[in-house]
């Protein structure tokens, strides 16, 4: 990975992986990539293989109790985590350690907001049958899942988490207001979007969006967002529509 300048106290992501060459990947493109080049955020891939044992740098072993696959060894992972921890706060609120795992809690926008408000993050990319539970417990790792599907490793999931998080860092997006009107920012899916031409193959832009009446446009967008959320994500709608408890 190419070294980039880093502004003082820039938000930093440390990624423990067997495939450091896969980073920054898509994060090196577009706005997140430009922000990385400018030093608005920093990325430090950590090669787990360098902490392996023996001539072949072994990082895994067979599961205790039998079964298929291999498990990442706790001693190997601990050495990588100790290196990653250098210069970082001990408080997990200031610097979460996140293990990308299919059994973790679902990753949500509020998690991205929480991570972005921290000083940085350490992401652990699993492989094979995962990581020894003892090191997960000992280091207070937070387990996050990016969807109900099993991947071959955590690298793609890590890039997803970083993309959602780094775009919330001040200065990364050209227009900070755009983050306030996106899907999930207020618990709803985003309303439909349109642009020129006004008539495309007989399909026209809803007249209210061309009316110039900002109040009516806002009402239309809110109604559309609510309807889409009810139809496509009833699980989100239940949370939004739930009456607030009086303080």
From Swiss-Prot:
Cellular compartments annotated: Cytoplasm
Positions in coiled-coil regions: none
GO BP, sorted A to Z: tRNA N1-guanine methylation
EC number: 2.1.1.228
Major localisation: cytoplasm
GO CC entries: cytosol
UniProt xrefs under Pfam families: tRNA_m1G_MT
InterPro entries linked to this entry: Alpha/beta_knot_MTases (IPR029028), tRNA_m1G_MeTrfase_C_sf (IPR023148), tRNA_m1G_MeTrfase_TrmD (IPR002649), tRNA_m1G_MTases_N (IPR029026), tRNA_MeTrfase_TRMD/TRM10 (IPR016009)
Key words of the record: Cytoplasm, Methyltransferase, S-adenosyl-L-methionine, Transferase, tRNA processing
Function recorded in the entry: Specifically methylates guanosine-37 in various tRNAs.
Protein name: tRNA (guanine-N(1)-)-methyltransferase
Organism field: Jannaschia sp. (strain CCS1)
Lineage: Bacteria, Pseudomonadati, Pseudomonadota, Alphaproteobacteria, Rhodobacterales
Gene: trmD
């Amino acid at each position: 990975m190419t070294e980039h300048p880093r502004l003082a106290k820039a938000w930093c992501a440390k990624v423990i992986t067997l495939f450091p060459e896969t980073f920054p990947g898509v994060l090196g493109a577009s706005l997140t990539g430009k922000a990385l080049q400018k030093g608005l955020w920093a990325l430090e891939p950590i090669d787990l293989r360098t902490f392996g044992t023996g001539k072949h740098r072994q990082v895994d072993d067979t599961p205790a109790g039998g079964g298929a696959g291999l498990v990442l060894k706790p001693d190997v992972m601990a050495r990588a985590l100790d290196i990653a921890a250098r210069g970082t706060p001990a408080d997990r609120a200031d610097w979460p350690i996140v293990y990308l795992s299919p059994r973790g809690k679902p990753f949500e926008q509020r998690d991205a907001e929480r991570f972005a408000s921290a000083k940085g993050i350490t992401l652990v990319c699993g492989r094979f049958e995962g990581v020894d539970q003892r090191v997960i417990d000992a280091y207070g790792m937070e387990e996050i899942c990016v969807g109900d599907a099993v991947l071959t490793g955590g690298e793609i999931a890590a890039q997803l988490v970083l993309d959602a998080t780094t775009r919330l860092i001040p200065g990364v997006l050209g227009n900070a207001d755009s983050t306030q009107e996106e899907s999930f920012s207020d618990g709803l899916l985003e309303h439909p979007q349109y642009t020129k031409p006004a008539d495309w193959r007989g399909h026209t832009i809803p007249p209210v969006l061309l009316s110039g009446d900002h109040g009516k446009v806002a009402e239309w967008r809110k109604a559309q967002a609510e309807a889409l959320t009810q139809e496509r994500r009833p699980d989100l709608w239940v949370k939004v529509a739930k009456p607030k408890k009086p303080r």
